[in-house]
């Protein structure tokens, strides 16, 4: 249950989660603008997955602080960022044999008989 009331604008009712999503989107863009020049994206294998995890974490923290019952506030965010941005990238990198991070795969010639 959120502390924010249901907003009614011109006869349309908007749930509190909509405003939490808009606020978390604004904070996500500000945080992303700060992180881009810092060089943290050089350590991230897949920036789109990292951005998704970052937005989910910001939304989770906003919704926890707006009145939702969250016992372990920061732990799920850290786990989500680690698993999606780093661990999944390493597993995919291992599957492709180390050639998928922007490097060219050496040409493989097959002898057809």
From Swiss-Prot:
Q: Which family does it belong to?
A: Belongs to the AaeX family.
Q: In its keyword annotation, does this UniProt entry include Calcium? A: no
Principal subcellular localization: membrane
What organism does this protein naturally occur in? Sodalis glossinidius (strain morsitans)
Under what name is this protein listed? Protein AaeX
Q: Where exactly are the transmembrane stretches of this chain?
A: 3-23, 43-63
What's a Pfam family in this record? DUF1656
Highest taxon, organism lineage: Bacteria
Instruction: Alphabetically list the UniProt keywords.
Output: Cell membrane, Membrane, Transmembrane, Transmembrane helix
List the membrane topology term(s). Multi-pass membrane protein
* This protein's GO CC annotations: plasma membrane
NCBIfam families linked to this entry: PRK11594.1
Protein's cellular compartments = Cell membrane
């Amino acid at each position: 249950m959120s502390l924010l009331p249901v907003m009614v604008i011109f006869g349309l009712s908007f749930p509190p989660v909509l405003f939490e999503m808009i606020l978390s989107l604004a904070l996500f863009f500000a945080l992303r603008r700060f992180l881009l020049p810092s060089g943290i994206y050089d350590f991230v294998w897949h920036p789109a997955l990292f951005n998704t995890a970052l937005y989910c974490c910001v939304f989770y923290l906003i919704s926890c602080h707006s009145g939702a019952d969250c016992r372990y506030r920061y732990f799920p965010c850290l786990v989500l960022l680690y698993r999606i941005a780093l661990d999944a990238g390493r597993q995919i990198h291992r599957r492709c044999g180390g050639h998928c991070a922007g490097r060219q795969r050496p040409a493989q010639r097959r002898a057809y008989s």
